[in-house]
Amino acid sequence: SGRRTWAATSAAGIKAGLGLEATAHSPCVTATPEKRRATLDRMRDAGISNVRALRGDPPQGETEWTATDGGLRYSRELIELIRDEYPEFAIGAACFPEVHIHATDAESDLRYTKEKVDAGAGFLITQLFYDNRCYYEFVGRAREIGIDVPIIPGIMPITNAGQIRKITSMCGSDIPERLQAELELRADDPAAATDFGVAYATLP
């Protein structure tokens, strides 16, 4: 599909144009293993080295995730496919400092993260977060159960306050009260809100 081609070409463009290593997303949603292999072939041919294996969100307009007929159900299955058939890729997976929105509890969510690592994920990228304590606490719990791969913070600077509220509500991330208050102060000045959001996400 166009979106899958876009993922490959965007990551390749970042690598070629900026000299930065990029990670292309490879979701299970709406794809059979055959389609997923075709996408992975394009990524490999484009010179991409890093692939982030995801289950993916429900298609636009739908609220429940359902597997495509004959498709993969879990990101772990996609990780295993890439591990076995595309050894040239470094495989990344998602993790959730504030717990996946559909997880039963934090413990089971973390156990599933370990299953992804055991299946072949060599690094993890977190869901976005705006409270560093969530990240550090998550890393500590992950290390305690034997997850020893790099855990990379997922950073999303706030450039649109309304949009970020929608995104965080969808993924279960929290916006701290102090950050909420600062955004409210700049509600009528989008440029100031963007400047603050970028500074909040990037400064120590």
Predicted features and spans:
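Active-site beta-loop-alpha junctions enriched in small/polar residues
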Residues: 1, 25-31, 54-58, 94-100, ...
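Catalytic beta/alpha-barrel core
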Residues: 1-3, 26, 49-54, 122-131, ...
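Active-site-adjacent beta->alpha loops and helix N-cap segments on the catalytic face
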Residues: 2-14, 32-38, 57-82, 103-106, ...
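Short, acidic/polar
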Residues: 7, 33-41, 104-115, 197-204
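Structural preference for beta-strand elements that scaffold enzyme active sites
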Residues: 21-25, 50-52, 88-94, 122-123, ...
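Conserved, mostly hydrophobic/aromatic
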Residues: 43, 116, 120, 153
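Active-site pocket-lining/capping segments in soluble small-molecule metabolic enzymes
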Residues: 69-96, 102, 145-203
